[in-house]
UniProtKB/Swiss-Prot annotation:
Sequence similarity: Belongs to the universal ribosomal protein uS13 family.
Main function: Located at the top of the head of the 30S subunit, it contacts several helices of the 16S rRNA. In the 70S ribosome it contacts the 23S rRNA (bridge B1a) and protein L5 of the 50S subunit (bridge B1b), connecting the 2 subunits; these bridges are implicated in subunit movement. Contacts the tRNAs in the A and P-sites.
Keyword Signal: no
PANTHER family with a match to the protein in the record: 30S RIBOSOMAL PROTEIN S13/40S RIBOSOMAL PROTEIN S18, SMALL RIBOSOMAL SUBUNIT PROTEIN US13M
GO biological process, one term: translation
Region feature Disordered, mapped onto this chain: 96-120
GO molecular function, one term: rRNA binding
NCBIfam families for the chain: uS13_bact
Keywords: Ribonucleoprotein, Ribosomal protein, RNA-binding, rRNA-binding, tRNA-binding
HAMAP family according to UniProt: Ribosomal_uS13
Protein origin, superkingdom: Bacteria
Protein name per Swiss-Prot or TrEMBL: Small ribosomal subunit protein uS13
Amino acid sequence: MARIAGVNIPNHAHAVIGLQAIFGVGQTRAQQICAAASVNPSTKVKDLTEAEMEALRDQVAKFTVEGDLRREITMSIKRLMDMGCYRGFRHRRGLPCRGQRTRTNARTRKGPRKAIAGKK
């Protein structure tokens, strides 16, 4: 198994699909990385030469991925919460912060329903 940015890339996958195993690399960015490294996107990872793997590693290193990206996202949310703005307040409460309704729905963000004693 090849390792790029601390992630094991599956050998059986095509290069463009294998790169998407890295957090922060989607379809478009994976295609850009393959093009910049002059690697055929449909080549299987196990068939890549060491020079091609090194070129892919160099291209991936130019982007913010994996731990650095996760840390950046966490720090952005923490900054909003420390600032005390509306979005930070919603993050702190565990509610949707992009204007969705919460009277009904929003179960993903709010978690499972909490039982309330019914009227008797």
